[in-house]
């Protein structure tokens, strides 16, 4: 059974209404085993699970505490221009997220390395560098083909309009696995009631041509 990891941290700082329990429904969780060649799949008709009482024009960012296995939980923010960085990203190589392995596959990966330290909330949105509560072990495919286009959409919208985007990224783990099966990404532009940005997707943490042991992070070329 696949589970979404929600740390109690969010409940301590925000009322339960802010962590919508519907995001744990079985239909969403089963998507983790249904990769069909696309980096992502729409969830809930591409409609995010936010409630109207969550919408605000004040920027914020909240990160879950790591669980007992050292895994990240929900990352939740209201992205505004004031959160976005004005300097280049700093060093993050000292962070070793759960399930991390440094391994190369030049046969199938142009950039060589299987894993990236993937920001749940991208650096261009939050300015977070080596925040261990915001970095998971993710494939190059997850990072570049899956998450980045959605992050770019949010970043471009905020820069162009000065508006806010409510944004939540939830890593999905199976049982006690150290590597996430993927992430659920939700976004909603606040001031224009979702006309500029609105999506709810599950992005697969896979790498074509590579077989991953999600329990440990070990990997091998597919036969």
Question: What spans do the regions from the language model cover?
Answer:
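N-terminal, intrinsically disordered, polar/charged segments of Gram-positive cell-envelope systems
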Residues: 15-59
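Domain-level detector of nuclease and nuclease-like folds
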Residues: 53-223
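Hydrophobic membrane-insertion alpha-helices, especially the h-region
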Residues: 1-13
């Amino acid at each position: 059974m696949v589970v979404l990891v929600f740390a109690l941290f969010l409940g301590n700082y925000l009322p339960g209404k802010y962590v919508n329990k519907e995001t744990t429904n079985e239909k969403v969780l089963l998507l983790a085993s249904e990769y069909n060649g696309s980096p992502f799949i729409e969830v809930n008709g591409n409609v995010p699970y936010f409630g109207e009482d969550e919408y605000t024009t004040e920027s914020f960012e909240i990160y879950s505490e790591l669980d007992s296995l050292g895994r990240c939980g929900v990352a939740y923010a209201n992205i505004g221009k004031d959160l976005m960085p004005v300097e280049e990203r700093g060093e993050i190589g000292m962070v070793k997220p759960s399930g991390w392995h440094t391994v190369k596959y030049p046969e199938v990966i142009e950039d060589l390395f299987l894993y990236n330290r993937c920001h749940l909330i991208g650096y261009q949105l939050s300015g977070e560098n080596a925040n261990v509560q915001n970095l998971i072990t993710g494939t190059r495919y997850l990072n570049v083909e899956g998450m980045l286009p959605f992050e770019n959409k949010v970043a471009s919208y905020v820069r162009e309009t000065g508006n806010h985007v409510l944004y939540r990224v939830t890593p999905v783990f199976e049982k006690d696995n150290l590597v996430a099966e993927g992430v659920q990404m939700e976004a909603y532009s606040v001031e224009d009631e979702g006309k500029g940005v609105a999506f709810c997707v599950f992005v697969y943490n896979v790498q074509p041509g590579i077989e991953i042991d999600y329990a440990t992070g070990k990997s091998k070329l597919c036969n």
